Amino acid sequence: MLKKNDIVEVEIVDLTHEGAGVAKVDGLVFFVENALPSEKILMRVLKVNKKIGFGKVEKYLVQSPHRNQDLDLAYLRSGIADLGHLSYPEQLKFKTKQVKDSLYKIAGIADVEVAETLGMEHPVKYRNKAQVPVRRVNGVLETGFFRKNSHNLMPLEDFFIQDPVIDQVVVALRDLLRRFDLKPYDEKEQSGLIRNLVVRRGHYSGQIMVVLVTTRPKVFRVDQLIEQVIKQFPEIVSVMQNINDQNTNAIFGKEWRTLYGQDYITDQMLGNDFQIAGPAFYQVNTEMAEKLYQTAIDFAELKKDDVIIDAYSGIGTIGLSVAKHVKEVYGVELIPEAVENSQKNASLNKITNAHYVCDTAENAMKKWLKEGIQPTVILVDPPRKGLTESFIKASAQTGADRIAYISCNVATMARDIKLYQELGYELKKVQPVDLFPQTHHVETVALLSKLDVDKHISVEIELDEMDLTSAESKATYAQIKEYVWNKFELKVSTLYIAQIKKKCGIELREHYNKSKKDKQIIPQCTPEKEEAIMDALRHFKMI
């Protein structure tokens, strides 16, 4: 039995979702940082539980041809670039696989094509926003990034994936904080003044916002600090203060103050101008966000008479991008400043058919339903926790033709798609987009279409209404699906089962009238699944 500090030779067979190597030894699964599939290593055991363990690389015996040898390991240790040791083409393949695996394991979906992940031409130095902790390290005020799975600061000046100008602003602010002897936050003692520095920079405009996150309102000589940093970076148009006096991991507190200039920066997205406030959500990779949103727009196949609901609308980036091409846009966002920004952004771009409210997405959806607003397309871009069940049910009740789902967490997206399918929607397209190169995170766009008589034949059998002989089994669709999965590990749809039943001469009761249109889009059962269904029908003595 392996124990702590044992050294053993292992081969890495897989990667976890977070990018750790996976090795199997003596019936245990070990997770190893900075190890890639096909690599053989000497592994030191760090920790062992009943079924899993953790190890670290003592020595590489065989290295992967896909290893990026040039990566500074500080970016791995901090988690800034937890996939940076893997070549970029392989990162994209890894992310495509993550999306496919989640859809299959969580939603049971294997028959919808997942397109290859859209990558970035230059996959470094892309982030338009930095959130940098300020701490004392060896007696000196430092800025940097926390070591992975800890709150121990690693001093850094080059963050690898951030806009280089943002890195320069952070270093300049660090030096000024030292010069003016402003005390960094001490998490253990709950003391000190400066907790975090947040810097935004417009990808197209170049405008810069600086946010000082402090534990109390008064900042000694703050006017002089601002004067000095603006001398170095005249592109700074906004200096904000956020006051966070709570014992929390949250970056921002509730109180905001404008110390210099305006309380927003302006940048462009898909041809529109957007004002971006300090607390507002705005995608951190502008170049790839435009591809992400354009994909969602293309998937939705918008028409002039479409009515759009833009849930989790942020500052209106996607809703305002489509407003000029549709009849109406209704957006909902929980952050008041973001709603105010979206309303200003609509005016800024002379858009009059976009309407925004401050509320939870599920509450707004229910209110709009009561008001008789009938959307044809719903756009959702929720946080990592995904959609609530009440929102999904309310959105399905609208009868919207199409739902374009933008997700930053494929696991919760797969969970939500599963419920949408139960409520009469079908997954049609999936496109991963790499908004976060060098990390394990991936954004995904999925298109759901409502099943209707114009495009699909949906059949349902009511066995109790059929005249079955004593030899026939009353196997339900669910039982047939379960049998096929247990024996063949294949997922088969109700439609496929119905097709094979019809082929075998089993009479079906149609749930809907068949469409009279010539061009019906009806998926056809594959030969492999047909044989599995036939086996099930024989098992249940239905043929």
Swiss-Prot record:
Residues 1-59 form the TRAM domain. The active site is at 408 (nucleophile). Coiled coil: none annotated. It holds the Pfam family tRNA_U5-meth_tr. Its EC number is 2.1.1.-. PROSITE patterns: SAM_MT_RNA_M5U, TRAM, TRMA_1, TRMA_2. CDD domains: AdoMet_MTases (cd02440). S-adenosyl-L-methionine binds at residues 283, 312, 333, 381. It is an enzyme of class 2 (transferase). One of its GO terms (molecular function) is rRNA (uridine-C5-)-methyltransferase activity. It comes from the Bacteria. Keywords: Methyltransferase, S-adenosyl-L-methionine, Transferase. GO terms for biological process: rRNA base methylation. Belongs to the class I-like SAM-binding methyltransferase superfamily. RNA M5U methyltransferase family. This is Uncharacterized RNA methyltransferase SP_1029. It comes from Streptococcus pneumoniae serotype 4 (strain ATCC BAA-334 / TIGR4). The lineage of its organism: Bacteria, Bacillati, Bacillota, Bacilli, Lactobacillales.
